[in-house]
């Protein structure tokens, strides 16, 4: 994963995964749990979502709502690592994520951009696994 690539130790880091889909949200919560990170699985209608995001060490955004998480969801005194998995269009039809990048980049310890963040990593991972899978299917 991207977090592993940058040698981010997940053990003991509080994580909030926003989005409960079977494609991203739930698998990501399992992955983080398997690396000893306590995880809160939330969604866009979680009551007082800011209470969770403002105290988290890691925030994974996968809710499918353009620029949903703005600066008010984060605490500059406790900067999180923010992974934006969202792929949306804003009001001008420009690609954007679930996180309002321009507002949050000055608050977050690290943040993935959209486009250019998680998307290329996904393509790389698919390509990395495609050849071995094809080789196995030919045997």
What role is predicted for each listed range?
Residues 77, 81-139:
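Rossmann-fold NAD(P)-binding glycine/threonine-rich loop
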